[in-house]
Amino acid sequence: MSNAWKMYKRLVAIETMRIFPPNVRGRPRKLKFDDAFDCILDVVRTGMQWRRLRPEHCSYITVFKTMHKWASAGVFRTAYIRLLELYSRRRRPKYYCIDSSYVKNVYGRDCTGRNPTDRGRRASKLSTIVDDMGIPHTFHAAPGNTSDQRLLEPLLSQMLVPPVPAAEMFADKGYDSARNRAHCREYGLRDRIFKRRTINGPRTHAKRGVIERFFSWHDKYRRLLVRYEQGIGIYLEMTYLAAGNLLANREIFGVGSV
């Protein structure tokens, strides 16, 4: 286990202790932090059902309720912001990439729409901005039938750390609009949004390979492939947990990797 991963786990522990201080009176909690964190991460990685968990000294329902309590308080997102700030101090990205991916929807209620690429089935659209190392800087969920042109502005406004001035922003033809180019200039970014008349070729996708690589990493967390959670906030918190695991295991802190 790397020092960066221990640091991320410690950040999550500090955030949980700040929001949910230990009980002074009454019985001690049966579920320890390490056991709860490891069980939640196992579910996100493998995609197993919660009832398949076999935690010690408690039931799987306790782990499930703990995850929902942490996610409702934004524990994983806050810890990821702290880790991303440490990462941003060490390196300055030269460019960013934006793209989205469809997530199949089973029980979700909000952020649900018809997926035009999957016979109109219900889906959510997960959008993200990554840097030149493939590290995500924000996530945004929208209904599956939302146009990409409407997603650039909320993503830029929700970036967890301020973007590097004069950096480039790469995007495909779906984001081509005068409004999106103006938004990039507002945040000090040089837009590299491909125009609709651009012919696809190797050069047009040279820099955008990092966003495709991130989604390949994202798909390795089996729980994130299909959305079973009713609220989109719980799904996004699990996404931030996976992103924190990805960032901590990368060799970018100078302390090695898992």
Each model region followed by its residue ranges:
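Short alpha-helical elements
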Residues: 1-258
